[in-house]
Amino acid sequence: MLLPLALADGESHVTIRGGTHVPFSPPFPYIHHVYLPTLWRMGVRAQVELQRYGWYPAGGGEITLSIQSNGGTLRPITLTERGPLRQVRGTAAVSNLPSHIAQRMANR
């Protein structure tokens, strides 16, 4: 829904509820740190905020998405060259498990 809203007139605000960190779906950090920056290069002006985590299988998460119209066009981008590695970053999180499990994952 993000791309059609970016091509539409005006500004849009969307609230999505459900799983934010679930199997077979992009987790919130991927959307925030990879997907949206790629779309930004194409002229899509969108911001996403995590309001509440939603873990599998319970869900209960919530994100808000704000999208500004870009005038109805997308800029082409070329993604054939990776370029220099600028940063490697990771996050370890657990739900309903002892915190030492996340710490152990982070230390690996």
Can you describe what each PLM-predicted range is?
Residues L7, R41-V44, Q51-R108:
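Phosphate/diphosphate-binding glycine-rich loops and adjacent basic-rich segments that engage nucleotide
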Residues M1-Q47, T64:
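A generic, well-ordered mixed alpha/beta core segment in the N-terminal half of proteins
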